[in-house]
Amino acid sequence: MAKRAYHNYWVYILTNKPNGTLYIGVTGGIDDRMERHIKGEGSKFTAKYKLKMLVYYEEFQYIDDAIAREKQLKNWHRQWKINLIEEHNPKWENLWKGDAETSSA
């Protein structure tokens, strides 16, 4: 079966501070998903640890590719994930600018 692209998909990593707790997720709408995480509605895990900083993301055309990458990252050792973040975002800055509130942990 041929792959169909509906829209773009994202694999993303959230945290609450540099080198803090990490959460890896996949979504078809990064803005909506981040707003839900900020409100504590994204997932119980992100709400519990107040994971509101988007520190890494990758964009995919196909959902199957995004899900495969999410699974791959979830199976990585923690240090590999940290290295990936620091390679692309060495200052651990919040990459989501949808709300000024999210710029602080």
How would you describe each model-predicted region?
Residues 1-43, 47-59, 64-71, 88-90, ...:
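GIY-YIG nuclease catalytic motif and its immediate N-terminal context
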Residues 44, 71-84:
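Short arginine-rich
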